[in-house]
């Protein structure tokens, strides 16, 4: 089954209910939300989610486990100086997700800053191990997102993501493949068979449980991270459609994070375009 949706807003007054209502209107069967603004860690009480109303009206169309949660961008679990805050916040975020039976938490791996890459990857692994200890009774899984290599980002290669997965050794840790990010990091999606073979050869394919499907405004290997609308960037519609329809990605939530136009988001048009055979 193809699972295709988008990032949708999560805001007052109806929070989750309106998020999923919008997703269904767009023709989606999965969705991604932030449980607050992407740039901060403020959170509302679970009672405001309108969760029971969502279950009653929409859970037959988009199940709780097909609602992906994205962690705030400002969290840096790879930082030797800021890891304690990341551990505390992400542990609390997982407990919030447990209440709603959400399954996947997408996490940017973080930045190495003034430290070196290996020390930061080791810190990231320690942070995740600690989070899993604190939330040992949880079913929530953390998905480390593949990054573009902008600035001092860690997670810019499959090997860096796999290094952390291998150190943590938990079935609760996997990967989120972002097409714009891997393109900007130097993985050529336009040579689709080579791209796919590398996913298999490196061993990361079996860990991918969420996909962010975005076109890119920049050249291959640019390390920029600038998303483009579907078929408006340098990856192009053909190869993004190949990902959507490839059986190896069956039943994986595929989430659009493409830019808004002057008239607002066009996720409905992009979803329809991608589902067309």
From Swiss-Prot:
Role description: Endonuclease IV plays a role in DNA repair. It cleaves phosphodiester bonds at apurinic or apyrimidinic (AP) sites, generating a 3'-hydroxyl group and a 5'-terminal sugar phosphate.
E.C. no: 3.1.21.2
Example GO biological process: base-excision repair
Catalytic activity reported: Endonucleolytic cleavage to 5'-phosphooligonucleotide end-products
NCBIfam families to which the protein is assigned, alphabetical: nfo, PRK01060.1-1
UniProt cofactor(s): Zn(2+)
Superkingdom of this protein's organism: Bacteria
Residues that coordinate or bind Zn(2+) 1: 70, 108, 145
The protein, known as: Probable endonuclease 4
Binding site for Zn(2+) 2: 145, 178, 212, 257
Classification via CDD domains: AP2Ec
Gene3D superfamilies assigned: Divalent-metal-dependent TIM barrel enzymes
Binding site for Zn(2+) 3: 181, 225, 227
GO molecular function, one term: deoxyribonuclease IV (phage-T4-induced) activity
Cofactor, free-text remark: Binds 3 Zn(2+) ions.
Root EC class: hydrolase
Keyword tags: DNA damage, DNA repair, Endonuclease, Hydrolase, Metal-binding, Nuclease, Zinc
Family the UniProt entry places it in: Belongs to the AP endonuclease 2 family.
SUPFAM superfamilies linked to this entry: Xylose isomerase-like (SSF51658)
Cross-referenced SMART domains: AP2Ec
HAMAP family on file: Nfo (MF_00152)
